[in-house]
Amino acid sequence: MAEEKKKSRIDDINRSVYDIKDEVEFSYKADRGLTEDIIRKISAEKEEPAWMLEKRLQALRIYESLDVPPWAPDISELDMDHIDTYIRPKTDRKARWEDLPQNIRDTFDRLGIPEAEKKSLAGVGAQYDSEVVYHNVQKELKEQGVIYVDFETAVKEYEDLIKPYFGQLITPRYHKFAALHYAVWSGGSFVYVPKGVHVRMPLQSYFRLNAPGAGQFEHTLIIVEEGADCHFIEGCSAPRYNVANLHAGAVELFVKKG
């Protein structure tokens, strides 16, 4: 009986909302392919610190030295020369849904993200192609010392927290696509919960890949100190296209004792 109810709930999901395609508008798109020049341009576009560029270039060298893992599915038709590794949407990051362009707002409305935030979430991040376009967190969490920001902001504003953990749980040498991720990562989330703090409502990050022929490479890093806890939800979706898209995100989760 329980299995029948579970199947019914899954079957009742309206999957058509995921397949609605938006017109692709961007303010910057990197050249297709994977070269040192492209990596440098992505890093410059993001105005990253030098240490992060060096991490990217190291990962690129590792990527070039590794074969596709033998346990991977057949992806022989995947050609990185035909993948857009970085697409910046035609908007900067907003803290209010109503400030987003209408097409992006409509996308997340269909997916139910704004409604979920109103009802049951302590914070929300929403990424569209390569960049987080919306991010908001309740004031109460900030007052408790909880950090929940997009990963680009974390790299620039919380470097002392990021550097000891970034790339330590999932290393670029883990496999070829881990190396690819670290070479071209963009977007994602950073969560830090101080010692003894209990985050009572969930945090959620949602990643929408809209452009055909694009890749999405968000990085999520979560640090939960001793005696603390939080509930983090991550979701993603993309329309169906007749060209190859690639998703190679990474999540690193560090939970201290207690």
Please tell me what each predicted stretch does.
Residues 2-258:
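Glycine-rich and polybasic anion-binding loops at the starts of cofactor/ligand-binding domains
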